[in-house]
From Swiss-Prot:
It comes from the Bacteria. Transmembrane segments: none annotated. It is found in: Cytoplasm. This is UPF0291 protein Nther_1806. One of its GO terms (cellular component) is cytoplasm. Belongs to the UPF0291 family. Disulfide bonds: none annotated.
Length: 60
């Protein structure tokens, strides 16, 4: 699930990146948070399509 805290932190890091740059640790955190966000979006899309996001995808 995508929480507002997750979105807020992603936005904070984005703003800092544009203003003054990020440390290596912040860059790693940013990547991790973005991946978590994308995973949540994919789950939401699959759920709306009627597929179980926890199941393995079908190979067509």
């Amino acid at each position: 699930m995508i929480s507002q805290d997750l979105i807020n932190r992603i936005n904070e890091l984005y703003k800092k990146q544009k203003e003054s740059g990020l440390t290596d640790e912040e860059q790693q955190e940013q990547q991790k948070l973005r991946q978590e966000y994308l995973k949540g979006i994919r789950k939401q899309v699959l759920k709306q399509m009627g597929e179980d996001p926890e199941k393995e995808p079908k190979n067509n």
